[in-house]
A protein has these predicted regions:
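Cleavable N-terminal export/targeting peptides
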Residues: 1-21
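Transmembrane beta-strands of outer-membrane beta-barrel proteins
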Residues: 22-26, 62-68, 82, 96-102, ...
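Outer-membrane beta-barrel translocator/channel fold
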Residues: 28-31, 58, 99-135, 139
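Solvent-exposed loop/turn segments connecting transmembrane beta-strands
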Residues: 35-44, 71-82, 92-94, 159-165
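Outer-membrane beta-barrel "beta-signal"
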Residues: 46, 166-178
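Residue-level signature of outer-membrane beta-barrel architecture
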Residues: 50-54, 72, 88-90, 140, ...
Length: 178
């Protein structure tokens, strides 16, 4: 997972990627608080996300913005994530916005349940190495360039693999729009 984080950072510093970046958001997320997961894992995630310019070729889908991010778990034996997908954001009032995201996540958590382990282990069993990811966000624009938001994200294999305990995060993020 450390290699993936460094590769992600290297990609983001390349000139073509920098030219396409629309916004960056970072914050702290509660790790696995539920309600759609087991709550087995604990701690705080350090979250960083890059949001790219809208895809004009997908205007029929509402011109979503691609995003890529990382959630580095700080809890003992907690699952870290590297994710990406498409996001949509709508202004709902003068400075308020809501957003949703749909994508995939690669994680370093447990995928197989070992019958020799206790039933209530301290790691979520996620079944697959690659999971689907759904997120929702509510935010406030502090200025033309700065914003603050609360994001909830859920990662799950949707029953495709044997185990599917899922993983939730919720937290506060600050954003900077270029």
């Amino acid at each position: 997972m450390k290699f993936a984080v460094w590769a992600f950072a290297l990609f983001l510093t390349s000139a073509p990627a920098m030219a396409q970046i629309d916004e960056m958001r970072a914050g702290l997320m509660l790790h696995d608080p539920g309600p759609f997961s087991t709550g087995k894992e604990d701690g705080v995630d350090i979250n960083a996300e890059v949001i790219f310019n809208p895809l004009s070729g997908l205007s029929w889908l509402g011109s979503p913005r691609p995003f890529a991010g990382v959630a580095i778990a700080t809890g003992d034996e907690a699952t870290s994530q590297l994710y990406g997908g498409l996001g949509w954001e709508v202004d709902i009032a003068q400075r308020y916005f809501v957003g949703v995201g749909l994508g995939l996540v690669v994680h370093d958590g447990e995928t197989d349940y070992d019958l020799g382990e206790p039933l209530f282990a301290d790691r979520a069993y996620l079944g697959c190495r690659v999971l689907g990811r759904l997120s929702g966000e509510v935010g406030y624009r502090l200025s033309e360039r700065l914003g603050a938001s609360v994001q909830f994200a859920h990662a799950s294999n949707a029953g495709i693999c044997d185990e599917n305990e899922g993983l939730d995060t919720i937290g506060f993020r600050l954003g900077y729009k270029f």
